[in-house]
From Swiss-Prot:
Stated name of the protein: Cytochrome P450 monooxygenase TRI1
One GO biological process term: secondary metabolic process
InterPro entries registered for this protein in UniProt: Cyt_P450, Cyt_P450_CS, Cyt_P450_E_grp-IV, Cyt_P450_sf
Cofactor names: heme
Membrane topology: Single-pass membrane protein
Positions with a binding annotation for heme: 469
One GO CC annotation: membrane
Function according to Swiss-Prot or TrEMBL: The biosynthesis of trichothecenes begins with the cyclization of farnesyl diphosphate to trichodiene and is catalyzed by the trichodiene synthase TRI5. Trichodiene undergoes a series of oxygenations catalyzed by the cytochrome P450 monooxygenase TRI4.
Top enzyme class: oxidoreductase
Keyword Cell division: no
The organism of origin for this protein: Fusarium sporotrichioides
Molecular-function annotations in GO: heme binding; iron ion binding; monooxygenase activity; oxidoreductase activity, acting on paired donors, with incorporation or reduction of molecular oxygen
Top-level taxon of the source organism: Eukaryota
Length: 542
């Protein structure tokens, strides 16, 4: 036991340093820890800098590099944001076979000439899904679950469903497709027989949403205004929110999403979608357990049948909306704008439609035989596709292409679409010619290649290669059905002095969202009797 002095303190207490000495010691230790922290952080930053400096880099020429002492890509991106098309055409007119790089809104991307499309089209080391979902959207943040579902499907659930069900049932879904179009066109374009202006894109987006929903989700949801509102708006809303979050450093984005009203609204859209979709699935699962369960033939049933792991049904349906509605709408808008600028093509189109329908009735064979309509749509897509560069991919490992172009792991690549307007490939390439592909299909060697749904390095409207749009056959039929009704039941024209101005930012190219057409309903129904609504109903019930 320690000895105790007269004051009552153990003698060892006097051996402790004075308070001032103790505080000095503590301060010195804190200074030491702070210095070590600074040294450690400097070491980490220096290590990352050395790692970045020494890592392999893409070797294609960079057209809009950062300037000296620039620490962000903001200026470089703004420099090219609205001039990407011209930059691509200028570069490839000088160097037709030489890749180049730009700093775009999603970072650096190497853009290849169309001549290299065949080399990369089926390369498994290049991921379309990771480039189009994980790189562009924030799949771990609430509200972006549809892109998370899409990111699972490099060659999985969604692709299987589209290939094995949607494409194989095209003939069976043609009648309900036409039935819904008959009703929807009347609702959205109206019955006014006087000339009146129609905001083209704002009218066609809900129209396409409703018609697509009829096939994907059935009759009930295609008339549900809440679902139509969510499906039509989610694509543009998610893109805006994704752009907003990209302004923040990655570690802060989740926190920002919790505080941002825009992010909360996006998450609410997904919750509302689940509130509509999940009860339908639950009811079907109950019916399935009964002896006389109802049979369904829509994408809800298809996904349930092919899902091998847990998935989010509502988010999957929203992802389908993202990849289908706005691209289909864009093609429709462009075709209507082009036809209104070339009214001489209208009567031949109407004649073809009437004659084919009288001969074949209402089926996919009839749509296939409408070669002039197919040609008109493909020509509009040729002159204004939805992107200046397509075949977006992200490298899963370091890749060196045949010409020596190096693509490091994690780098994005794409292929320029300028060949679609190349005078060396197309006669009068800059002019719209509705008969261009019609004439090509008269030559047996080009019968397949000249169809709207066909792709090649010279026409990549639906992409190209292993990741070509799997829903392009349905999209082509859907656009044709809508065009049939608009051509036979309505007249339209471009208002005097009006000229649509497509929007271009980075590699995206969209039709003018403010453009209006003048439209009027024809006085008499110009559609053959077998296409009446009553006929549809009888066919659907039989």
């Amino acid at each position: 036991m320690s000895k105790v002095d007269k004051t009552g303190y153990a003698q060892w207490v006097y051996l402790l340093p004075e308070r001032s000495s103790m505080m000095s010691f503590i301060d010195s230790m804190e200074d030491f820890r702070f210095d070590m922290l600074i040294y450690f952080l400097c070491f980490v930053v220096l290590g990352r800098a050395v790692q970045w400096f020494l890592r392999p880099k893409p070797n294609a020429p960079l057209l809009n590099p950062r300037r000296f002492f620039e620490f962000s890509d903001s200026r470089a991106v703004s420099e090219i944001l609205y001039s990407t098309r011209q930059v691509l055409e200028d570069w490839f007119s000088k160097y037709p076979t030489k890749p180049m790089r730009i700093i775009a809104d999603l970072g650096q991307i190497t853009i290849l000439p169309p001549s290299m499309a065949d080399e990369i089209k089926n390369d498994p080391r290049l991921s379309f899904i990771k480039a189009s979902t994980e790189s562009a959207f924030h799949i771990t943040i609430p509200g972006f679950e549809p892109f998370r579902e899409g990111a699972k499907n490099e060659a999985g659930l969604i692709k299987n469903v589209l290939h094995k069900h949607l494409n194989k049932t095209l003939n069976h879904i043609t009648t309900p497709l036409a039935e819904e179009t008959c009703l929807a066109v009347q609702e959205y374009f109206g019955s006014d027989q006087g000339w009146h202006k129609v905001p083209l894109r704002d009218t066609l987006v809900p129209l396409v949403t409703r018609i697509s929903t009829r096939i994907f989700l059935g009759q009930d949801l295609c008339r549900n205004q809440e679902w139509l509102r969510i499906a039509a708006s989610y694509s543009s809303t998610s893109a805006e929110v994704a752009n907003h979050l990209r302004r923040w450093p990655k570690p802060l984005r989740y926190l920002v999403s919790l505080l941002s009203p825009e992010c909360q609204n996006l998450a609410k859209q997904v919750r509302n979608a689940r509130a509509l979709i999940n009860p339908i699935l639950e009811r079907r699962r109950v019916e399935e357990g009964q002896e006389k369960g109802t049979s369904y033939n829509d994408s809800l049933e298809w996904f349930e049948r092919y899902a091998r792991e847990a998935y989010d049904p509502a988010a999957t349906q929203l992802f389908l909306s993202v990849v289908s509605i706005h691209t289909t709408t864009d093609l429709l808008c462009q075709a209507l704008e082009d036809i209104s600028s070339h009214p001489e093509i209208i009567k031949p189109l109407q004649h073809e439609i009437r004659e084919v329908l009288k001969q074949e009735g209402w089926n996919t064979k009839a749509l296939y035989k409408m070669k002039l309509l197919d040609s008109v749509l493909k020509e509009s897509q040729r002159l204004k596709p939805v992107q200046h560069a397509t075949m977006l991919r992200l490298a899963l490992e370091d890749i060196t292409l045949e010409d020596g172009t190096f693509i490091p792991k994690g780098h994005q690549i794409s292929v320029s679409c300028h060949a679609m307007r190349d005078n060396e490939i197309y006669e009068n390439a800059s002019s719209w010619d509705g008969y261009r592909y019609y004439r090509q299909r008269e030559q047996s060697a080009n019968e397949h290649k000249a169809q709207l749904s066909s792709t090649s390095p010279e026409h990549m409207g639906f992409g190209y290669g292993i990741h070509v749009c799997p829903g392009r056959f349905f999209a082509a039929n859907e656009v044709k059905v809508i065009m049939i009704y608009l051509l036979l039941q309505y007249e339209w024209r471009t208002p005097p002095g009006s000229q649509p101005k497509p929007l271009s930012w980075c590699t995206t190219w969209a039709t003018d969202p403010t453009f209006e057409l003048e439209v009027r309903r024809k006085g008499s129904d110009d559609i053959p009797v077998e296409l009446s609504h009553n006929t549809f109903s009888r066919e659907s019930e039989s």
